[in-house]
Regions:
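Transition segment at domain starts
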Residues: 21-79
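Short proline/glycine- and polar residue-rich coil/turn motifs
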Residues: 116-122
Length: 157
């Protein structure tokens, strides 16, 4: 009985440890195109695009709290929807439970969660939910929910 309990504890601790530490050694590269935003807006119709995208603002990521982050983030409007786009030069230290948030003037807003980070490298598109007032924010954050720590931030100008 005692050996079973010890084995179960070791398995649980090992699993949690792997979940927390493995992202530091694993990179996930994403390669989404800007055209995918237009396709989504048009409902995946195969005809030539009639919807145009407009870059509203952009900024460069900087790492925070000892983490590395670099690359370009853009706020893009397509039709009546807004998107955050990370360009191909984007990279951030990988970690557990990373999410994309919006923030303002040096503070991320926990109520402005966009989506979980698709990968720690490469071009990515994130649709901003209609419930979020884009005009209230001027920053994009990569935030680790598990440890409540910022990995990177881009100020949008």
């Amino acid at each position: 009985m005692k050996k079973s309990i010890v084995a179960i504890v070791i398995i649980i601790v090992g699993g949690v440890g792997y979940w927390l530490i493995s992202p530091l050694f694993i990179d996930k590269k994403v390669n989404e195109s800007i055209e995918e935003i237009m396709m989504k807006q048009e409902g995946n119709k195969p005809q030539p695009s009639m919807v145009t995208s407009q870059e509203i603002s952009s900024g460069t990521f900087a790492g925070l709290a000892g983490h590395n982050a670099e690359g370009t983030a853009k706020l893009i409007r397509t039709g009546d929807k807004y998107y955050i786009r990370f360009e191909d030069d984007f990279s951030v230290t990988n970690g557990p439970d990373l999410f994309v948030y919006l923030g303002k003037d040096g503070r991320y807003d926990p109520d402005a969660r966009i989506e979980s980070l698709k990968g720690n490298m490469g071009s990515q598109n994130y649709e901003i939910p209609g419930s979020i007032a884009v005009s209230n924010y001027n920053e994009v954050w990569v935030w680790c929910r598990a440890f409540s720590v910022a990995f990177g931030k881009a100020e949008l100008n």
